[in-house]
């Protein structure tokens, strides 16, 4: 009926003697549902430390969204700076909509939050399940976030303002952002998102990034040396069916992205980059990319870069050239240029298999635009196809191609050089 405020101390809240539910009141007469200023069910302040669902039976935290209809509602938990919240696997959060001030999420955290539980059927304005601002958010273990919606960005999670987000061994699916980041949205300089492992699938966005958006100066890391996440069957209305990295608009657009290991498969983009679309850097930003040991396959886009799309001012993380190495880029499709990779800036490709990609126009394996430069070293380009079987089944060169003798381009693939273009 009213907000429970934890000002100090350590508390463990479990269900005993059977499953239990803590539910938001459905009466608009109660203070928690004051339509001028609806409250959170829990507020965790200062040095307080609260754990839900550490053991015992299932504890359900219910936000009563379906019962309250179109009423003004706030989220379930607000963790303020210095507060600590852990939700463990014997708890779950459901049926919560935060529409208060058009900026909130069911869980709002500025502190230290760890999630190892189910979150489902929730909705927010920035983050369908969780919004992390300046805090540390760890999502791990048995976490399952599903069927959540953000009216803006981050269908499941929104991370910003120097927020630190890590995801490991978790699953996020059937979430939707009406704008960007069907599952995850991370932005701002000094913010970071690290996805070590897990599954992110069947999410969608109205604009870019069907699964994961990172931009406006943020850092994104996918995978680790021994394993990586599976990002599959996501759909975006704009660029980046799977991942939109170094994204954004305006002077602060860009970021730093490192792909260490993982798979990005069967994603669909309504613009560029069926698997991955890397964004252009703004005048105050940078767009840096390093990729190794990735599988980018069976992705589709309506424009260019069926597998990967790279921008004009792309760089490496410490090198002049963005680096794509030791990876498989296979069976991707685009309607225009670059079935496997669309190169607009300086890109170094080494020891990659670029095979069985298709384009309806030019450069089934790789398309190099005017102003783009590709250094190609080792690896194989084979069995890629264009609609007319002429215009660069292997590589279409409208920019510069620098190729090492150790690289292999199969006889069934063609390097197409328009008049005035050459190979170094």
Predicted regions and their residues:
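Extracellular beta-strand-rich solenoid/capping regions of secreted or surface-exposed proteins
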Residues: 2-12, 25-55, 62-86, 97-113, ...
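Extended aliphatic helical segments
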Residues: 6, 12, 50, 79, ...
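Ordered hydrophobic segments in well-structured contexts
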Residues: 12, 41-43, 51, 76, ...
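Right-handed parallel beta-helix
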Residues: 16-19, 53-63, 84-97, 113-123, ...
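Glycine-centered small-residue motifs that form tight turns
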Residues: 39-40, 69-76, 101-107, 125-132, ...
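Hydrophobic aliphatic residue packing
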Residues: 44, 79, 107, 130, ...
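Extracellular beta-strand/loop-rich repeat segments of large surface/secreted proteins
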Residues: 396, 400-424
